[in-house]
């Protein structure tokens, strides 16, 4: 990373980068943050520093969390307020524009055909996709949802866990960790369920029925925070 930062004119991020934020760069380098979401349901970045599920305040300062950005891409004017808080920047660095992930969402890549060819046993059911955000209670919450679908005929629950959480194990259900991306699974799904994940905004682009499963809303609000 250090070599490419030293030899590049532009660096584009979709997450926090230690090398970008901690190092001093040449003045000609432009750093663009295009966060990996189309919105901000939950508090994140600097918004969540010091909370139970956020970063430690001393560590975030020592690691210069979200420093050195020249521009922050925001998908809407309403989201801009939360992005300024999360990235510690003012309005002069915010650029309102559509994000590349929207093009990915709208691109037809035959995901359904490929998925059902590989998983023919799922082709006759309505697919309900559960996309939880990362939190320590993931497995417990997923088990609750499993109970809700236990006696529902004609629907198959697919659980796609957050990339940071790999401990979800749901017996007799289809816990997915294969080669299809989250967007592929969203294209396949008939119904999408989430909680505090920004995938809710992606689901709205797909025009799919969307439900929020938030049995821990009060606890999560106090531990992490909701925008």
Q: Could you tell me what each predicted segment is?
A:
Residues 43-47, 107-109, 169-172, 222-225:
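Short aromatic-enriched loop/helix-cap "lid" or pocket-rim segments at secondary-structure transitions
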